[in-house]
From Swiss-Prot:
GO terms for cellular component: peroxisome; plasma membrane. This is Probable inactive receptor kinase At2g26730. It comes from Arabidopsis thaliana (Mouse-ear cress). The chain crosses the membrane at residues 258-278. Residues 289-329, 619-658 are annotated as: Disordered. It is a single-pass membrane protein. Disulfide bonds: none annotated.
Length: 658
């Protein structure tokens, strides 16, 4: 009986705990929904009410997902005033980052409930009002950055309540009055470009001049020494009590002479005082003019949009730096496409460690690892001729394309000097690297089933671009076919041709361009089909279209294959790595016929892309998975049906009609 009672009590306790966790999660979820519903935002966060808040973009929970510990929404286009009763209800929050948005108004007083908060980043917004008193009650705060806003009034002495604070960034606001003596263990401190005056307290004098620059009336510490223009000079002995001196020496000076001396001395003093005031006003006017000409934010490093290999930096929670983009980069922000899964901004990209993945005809691709661990690919375009409006219009079209075999555009950036595209990172790499990588003894060959899978999934992606999106790819090649670990592919670098000038002809040695593109310098759906046909030949032969060993100098891959087939040496066409697999000759010949139809020199004789896809799927034989793709087998002793073939089963491939 006692054991039953213990079990019932345990179950009751678990039920109460579960109910409590659910209520806490529901309350925090509702707080976030309240925030999102009352704050307009340019980039849709697409928080699904039916999903757990812990799975939403920018939201991180604790290990058991009972409470929200981090909310990061930098550069997400948030506009307006934070509603009371929203974020202030996230009482377990540790990190809050709303930087680089257009949030305005005063900070809600219920922010004082965020007593567990350690890092608060609100820089580069339009917040106003005096220093929020709610901040001084956040005793666990370590980093506070409210720089580049419109805060006014004095900096309160109660900042000293934040005993754990190591970084305080208040620059580029309208704070005025004297600096309070802040006796905290600050490592980073910045109040530049405000209206502060008076002397810098000794407790803050250890920081560099850059921390205080832009405050004209601030002095002391690392700045100029404080001086008073109204200190009376030591009086001359000749003017000390002249009447007494005269009387002691029994001077014969008359009273009129004494009065004249006093008046003259007063006039000289007034002239000196007027001169000092004139010099003071002149100096102040010059300082104001210099400050007016100084671009804001001053004292903050402006960073060029460059991702050099090996660049790196520490996490936001560690640095808390208030890097301003300034000028054009402030006006041209990173634009996220609809349905994006990322929440970072241009500043994050600039601080990311970067590695060059490759250089192509349209630009250079970098692997960028952001501070929170997210990995993306940043393509830096070159020689873009499109205007900003044309660029943005084309990116809106590209950004709407969603398909499992088309890599999605996540974000883009346009400025006069830089054009950037952001994509998902595919760790398996490209078809080019997999097919033409080192062919030494340590290489794992790409078997036939995986080559068929690559051909089908790439065809599906390209057919979607042509049929559903009505978009010409324009740059199909093996390096633009990216792979998932299961050998499914994603087509990349699509729809970019309209951004570049047609004045320069494509490089014929590239090997993928249709003959008519060399003449018209325009890509079409049929030229895409030609390029895809070259890609199929590449899968079949194992040869790169750029490979010099195709025979005659200047011969391309389609002509080389055609010359071999005409001599009825069809077997010589196929990649030697495929010769170890049995019972696949018929499929290889069928795929070769499809490829040769695609690379017809007459555009009208080429099939449309959806027909190409249908033909490739027909080649795919009986052993299929649920998605219509065959299971891969790396065992060359097994036939394509999974059976061990007899030793004499290999038959010569049938001929291909040119």
């Amino acid at each position: 009986m006692a054991s039953i009672s213990w079990v019932l009590n345990s179950l009751f306790s678990i039920l109460l705990l579960t109910q409590r966790v659910n209520s806490e999660s529901t309350a925090e979820k509702q707080a976030l929904l309240t925030f999102l519903q009352q704050i307009p935002h340019e980039n849709r966060l697409q928080w699904n009410e039916s999903d757990s808040a812990c799975n939403w973009v920018g939201v991180e929970c604790n290990s058991n997902q009972s409470s929200i510990h981090s909310l990061r929404l930098p550069g997400t286009g948030l506009v307006g005033q934070i509603p009371s009763g929203s974020l202030g209800r996230l009482t377990e929050l540790r990190v809050l980052s709303l930087r680089s948005n257009r949030l305005s108004g005063q900070i809600p007083s219920d922010f004082s409930n965020l007593t567990h908060l350690r890092s608060l980043y609100l820089q580069h917004n339009e917040f106003s009002g005096e220093f929020p008193t709610s901040f001084t009650q956040l005793n666990n705060l370590i980093r506070l950055d409210i720089s580049s806003n419109n805060f006014t009034g004095s900096i309160p002495f109660s900042v000293n309540n934040l005993t754990h604070l190591t970084g305080l960034f208040l620059g580029n606001n309208g704070f005025s009055g004297n600096l309070p003596s802040i006796s905290l263990g600050l490592v980073d401190f910045n109040v530049s470009n405000n209206n502060l005056n008076g002397s810098i307290p000794s407790s803050l004098s250890r920081f560099s001049a850059e921390s205080f620059t832009g405050n004209v009336d601030l002095c002391g510490g690392p700045l100029k020494p404080c001086k008073s223009f109204f200190v009376s000079p030591s009086p001359s002995p000749s003017l000390i009590n002249p009447s007494n001196r005269l009387s002691s020496k029994k001077s014969k000076l008359s009273k009129a002479a004494i009065v004249a001396i006093i008046v003259a001395s007063a006039l000289v003093a007034l002239l000196l005082l007027a001169l000092l005031l004139f010099l003071c006003l002149r100096k102040r006017r010059g300082s104001n003019e210099a400050r007016t000409k100084q671009p804001k934010p001053a004292g903050v490093a402006t960073r060029n949009v460059d991702l050099p290999p090996g660049a790196s930096s520490s996490k936001e929670e560690v640095t808390g730096t208030s890097s301003g983009m300034g000028g054009e980069t402030e006006r041209n922000k990173l634009v996220f496409t609809e349905g994006g899964v990322y929440s970072f901004d241009l500043e994050d990209l600039l601080r990311a460690s970067a590695e060059v993945l490759g250089k192509g005809s349209v630009g250079t691709s970098y692997k960028a690892v952001l501070e929170e661990g997210t990995t993306v690919v940043v393509k830096r375009l070159k020689d873009v001729m499109a205007s900003k409006k044309e660029f943005e219009t084309q990116m809106e079209v590209v950004g709407k394309i969603k398909h499992p075999n088309v890599i999605p555009l996540r974000a883009y950036y346009y400025s006069k000097d830089e054009k950037l595209l952001v994509f998902d990172f595919m760790p398996t790499g490209s078809l080019s690297a997999l097919l033409h990588g080192s062919r030494g003894s340590g290489r794992t060959p790409l078997d036939w089933d995986n080559r068929m899978r690559i051909a089908i999934t790439a065809a599906r992606g390209l057919a979607h671009l042509h049929v559903s999106a009505k978009l010409v790819h324009g740059n199909i090649k093996a390096s633009n076919i990216l792979l998932h670990p299961n050998q499914d592919t994603c087509v990349s670098d699509y729809g970019l041709n309209q951004l570049f000038s047609n004045s320069s002809p494509p490089n014929r040695l590239a090997g993928y361009h249709a003959p008519e593109v060399l003449e018209t310098r325009k890509v079409t759906f049929k030229s895409d089909v030609y390029s895809f046909g070259v890609l199929l030949l590449e899968l079949l032969t194992g040869k790169s279209p750029n490979q010099a060993s195709l025979g005659e100098e200047g011969i391309d891959l389609p002509r080389w294959v055609l010359s071999v087939v005409r001599e009825e040496w069809t077997a010589e066409v196929f990649d030697v790595e495929l010769m170890r697999y049995h019972n696949i000759e018929e499929e290889m010949v069928q795929l070769l016929q499809i490829a040769m139809a695609c690379v017809s020199t007459v555009p009208d004789q080429r099939p449309v892309m959806q027909e190409v896809l249908r033909m490739i799927e027909d080649v795919n034989r009986s052993e299929t998975t649920d998605d219509g793709l065959r299971q891969s087998s790396d065992d060359p002793s097994k036939g394509s049906e999974g059976q061990t073939p007899p030793g004499e089963s290999r038959t010569p491939p049938r001929s291909v009609t040119p």
